[in-house]
Amino acid sequence: MESADSGRSDPVKGDDPGPSFVSSPPATPSRYESQKRRDWNTFLQYLKNHKPPLALSRCSGAHVIEFLKYLDQFGKTKVHVAACPYFGHQQPPSPCSCPLKQAWGSLDALIGRLRAAYEENGGRPDSNPFAARAVRIYLREVRESQAKARGIPYEKKKRKRPPTVTTVRVDVASSRQSDGDPCNVGAPSVAEAVPP
């Protein structure tokens, strides 16, 4: 009895005269790739809703900073203002009315994803607004101000230098030559190799 698709060959059984590979459905994107796509779509939507609407080709570092400031309204990190009695306290004892903002780490990661997405979507690296100097300066200022406001020092991680190897030269040859055997120069004797 023949099935309805008997005219097709089965690549799994090996009777396919074509290429020897089996095509599989595209792999599901990683969390990073999914987040990058969502971030990219959010940024494009922001440009579309911008007054006046802004084309990606006309986008600059200033527009990226404006976008980051816009995102602050959705933040969940309490950032104390200078006049707040809890300014500089890591664990304030009671609630205050200071604003919630996007955490510096979240903004930094977002910019990294958008920077990559821009180039993956045809943007030139030399015109990438997410890599603009103004954006880097803004992120640095956000990091420093949040560190002061929350009492958390953000210290740059110092690179661990590889340990320096000190070589010590031991002159074994002079003690060997005193034994009178020129062939054993530099080679340990069995008596020296075995502990007493």
UniProtKB/Swiss-Prot annotation:
UniProt region (Disordered), positions on chain: 1-36, 149-196
Subcellular location as annotated: Nucleus
InterPro entries in the record: ALOG, ALOG_dom
Keywords associated with the record: Developmental protein, DNA-binding, Nucleus, Transcription, Transcription regulation
Pfam families: ALOG_dom
Parts of the chain that traverse the membrane: none
Biological process per Gene Ontology, one example term: mRNA transcription
Domain ALOG: 31-158
GO molecular function, one term: DNA binding
Compositional bias ranges of the Basic and acidic residues kind: 1-16
Similarity field: Belongs to the plant homeotic and developmental regulators ALOG protein family.
Function statement: Probable transcription regulator that acts as a developmental regulator by promoting cell growth in response to light.
Protein name: Protein LIGHT-DEPENDENT SHORT HYPOCOTYLS 6
Gene source species: Arabidopsis thaliana (Mouse-ear cress)
